[in-house]
Amino acid sequence: MTMFGLQLLLTAAVINMLVRTDEEHGLRADWEAGCILLTGCFAGAGYIACAHGREHPMIWMIYLILAVYLTVCVLTDRQTCKVYDCLQLPAALFGTALCMMRPVPAQGGAALVCFALLQYFLFMRLYGRGDGMTFQISSLYIIGAGGSLETLLSHMAAAFALLGVVQLVRGNINRKGNLKLPVPFLPYIACSLLWFL
């Protein structure tokens, strides 16, 4: 089975699990959901093949879990403005495994702690808890790829910049610089993460 096929299968299984366990899930099988699934699977499989094709298969699995996590979270955030807590633990565990498999300097560990404190005490007030947890999980993968605190903050800035540009083009920003209508933030977090892995 190809990486794309495996990611599509795992993503569908996770969505099926969410539908079965949450009676008020609100997820719809529509054109937009299909586009999110295909885009997420192509982006995940493409990234794994291009950036990690020659590495150990365990590295592929770690990034596959991240790709499934982000694809499902983008779909649920887009359709229901919900990020399921049950998805956080597997993605965080595999991100931690990545940090343990690669030589992460002490500055990387300090960056994770500092970033976590910034998220919990400052930034989560600007956006939802699910978005904050996604930034936290992304930070594990960024540090595992050799990133620093500056990289983590740059990822946040890029996500906000991408959100701002797209919403400006859509005419969803008022004169004070705020969003007229709230929009899901997780798609912008996921897209900007590809630049920093």
PLM regions and their residue ranges:
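A membrane-topology feature that recognizes alpha-helical transmembrane segments
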Residues: M1-L197
